[in-house]
Amino acid sequence: MTIENGIAKAIYVDGTKFVLNGRHVSYCFHVDDETGDLRTDHFGGRVTGAIPVDPSPVVDGWTGMPDRVRREFPDQGRGDFRIPALRIRQAEGHTVSALKYQSYTLLHGKPDLPGLPATFGTEKDVSTLVVHLRDEYSSVTADLIYSVFPEYNAIVRSVSITNNGFQPISIEALASFSTDLPYEDLEMISLRGDWAREAHRMRRKVEYGTQGFGSTTGFSSHLHNPFLALAHPSTTESQGEAWGFSLVYTGSFEVNVEKGSQGLTRAVLGFHPNQLSWPLSPGETLTSPECVAVYSNHGLGGMSRSLHRLFRDHLIKSKFATANRPVLLNSWEGLYFDIDETSMIRIAKESAALGVKLLVMDDGWFGKDYPRTSDAAGLGDWVPNPARFPNGLAPMVDQITSLKVANSSANLLFGIWVEPEMVNPDSALYREHPEWALHAGSYPRTEQRNQLVLNLALLEVQEFIINFMTDLLSSAKISYVKWDLNRGINETSAPKATHAYMLGMYKVFDTLTSRFPDVLWEGCAAGGGRFDPGILQYFPQIWTSDDSDAVERIFIQMGSSLAYPASAMGAHISAVPNHQTGRTTPLSLRAHVAMMGGSFGLELDPSQVSAEEKALIPELIALAEKVNPIVLTGDMWRLSLPEESNWPAVQFISQDQSQVVLFYFQLSPNVNHSMPRVRLQGLDEDAMYRVDGAGPYSGAMLMNLGLQYSFRTEYGSRVVFLEKQ
């Protein structure tokens, strides 16, 4: 076995056998000598030495039964009746393909994906193998692009399909990643939900046949996240094998898991085939989004930590990826649409007095001829409402940013809310350009929340958004943008329109975030409707959910952490009774849950907060700022889950292992009963730790015996600091 070009010692090639190695993972496949097909040999713990190759099966004298083998890139029409990774409608109308191995290329580092978000790294971080396939009958070629991040136990794959023939074809289905795992009992874990209850984990047995999920909303959606985990039934948070797959894409997607008749399990992630049908004329190429695949032999927690580190280090491009985030106050749940210059200056002064560092003006600030005083009008008219802001934004923003923050040498920062991808029919923009809204022929345009979707596949729409955002951000001292989206895509001119939209959207994001690198951008889609790796490429944080109830947020944020780092989560203290659930919870619980997010803030009107709670907020802000660096960059350990325990617990360990913060909660009262111990994980068993100043205690004691706390009421919470001696 030889190392080609010395590429990070991560990619080994021996003839037509390929081995991709991470620190604790190996991904192996080979070319079948008889068929030229790629066959998967292993995806799991690291292996050394010769990799045994399974021969083509022999069944009653028939050889090469393709539905009985592990295939690396299964096409359609040649006897593999399982889910294909590729389906091409050829010029003649059929969907048969015959892609065979041609050659390979090795690359230092990792190439960009044209027009798509993608992981990145230098040649010290990542190595790339490109496997070239060709269909000799249609002259269609496929490049399978594998990038290995050894320190993260991650394999990243995308696919490029090129029509080198003379007739047009159509790509009907294309998966970014597909893998066949050997026969064994497995379970699949996914994140399901809806508006205000995103990212609830669902774990179920992989049965014979096909099971899956996806989104046809045009976006990744509240309903299902583009993430999949596979694990053995015995796998826990800390023990056992787990495979994680995360699609770096914001559009409609499909994930399928199929256990075939022979017991092999195939996982396929990629475009949703109902919204593709991508035409390829001769010479044209379609490139899939990439999919990140990680392997862990330390349970689901190990899988999550690999994804978290990779996304923080090699996906999020923003300078704020691991930078401390300013504590913010957002006006939405405090004022809703009832904002003007007077109310914003008032709330700014009250925020600064509490120690808030950033004031965000949410919806309701724009619209001239069609004022944005409700959700019925104004979207698309991105100029300040002259009745509410008679002097424009700049004088008000100057006054706000001149305010000194209490207990700080800093001035208050200012941020603003926008929803650039949408338009109200009651707007000057729609009156001038109704053709800019997505539509399907003469069919009526379905409104949701009184709004339509602009067609970001159109160059003129892209330029409109880039230009007005450039003007807005240049008009005043704006340090933060909350970019929202509040409906899905219904009518489109063709199935391909949703991916064309994505390409236009990514172009807009890339242009604006490159043009304004000092702005902190936050993604939002009615909460977590676009909480996906594609958004994280450009926006380092996302509003996790419109549900700000502390108890619900424990489920939502811990569910989201299966795939996404806490650094990406926006979480706020809101007023009680909560506006979504009607529940009343203590301020301490609301604050402690919000501190588990990378972007901590408040979502209320300070003038409506009781004097008792207002007196506590500065202390809680100080605690949040102490916690924030560890939450942003530390390794996260889910010690107990809210679905399984009345006492959910989460732990973060700083990168240098010197600091630990524990979040511990009680959901229901515990009457006349002993309390469980919470056992920490990931500590140095031989080291000594101080726990909130007490001790020291050994790491072994803290992990094996644990800590015990009691709560007097339901909705109890505690934040505990440990320091390594």
UniProtKB/Swiss-Prot annotation:
One of its GO terms (molecular function) is alpha-galactosidase activity. Glycans are attached at N407, N490, N672. It is an enzyme of class 3 (hydrolase). Its main location: secreted. Its EC number is 3.2.1.22. It is found in: Secreted. InterPro entries: Aldolase_TIM, Alpga-gal_N_sf, Alpha-glycosidase_related, Glyco_hydro_36, Glyco_hydro_36_C, Glyco_hydro_36_N, Glyco_hydro_b, Glycoside_hydrolase_SF. It catalyses: Hydrolysis of terminal, non-reducing alpha-D-galactose residues in alpha-D-galactosides, including galactose oligosaccharides, galactomannans and galactolipids. The active site is at D484 (nucleophile), D546 (proton donor). Keywords: Carbohydrate metabolism, Glycoprotein, Glycosidase, Hydrolase, Magnesium, NAD, Polysaccharide degradation, Secreted. It comes from the Eukaryota. GO terms for biological process: polysaccharide catabolic process. GO terms for cellular component: extracellular region. Its cofactor is Mg(2+); NAD(+). Homotetramer. Belongs to the glycosyl hydrolase 36 family. Hydrolyzes a variety of simple alpha-D-galactoside as well as more complex molecules such as oligosaccharides and polysaccharides. This is Probable alpha-galactosidase G. The lineage of its organism: Eukaryota, Fungi, Dikarya, Ascomycota, Pezizomycotina.
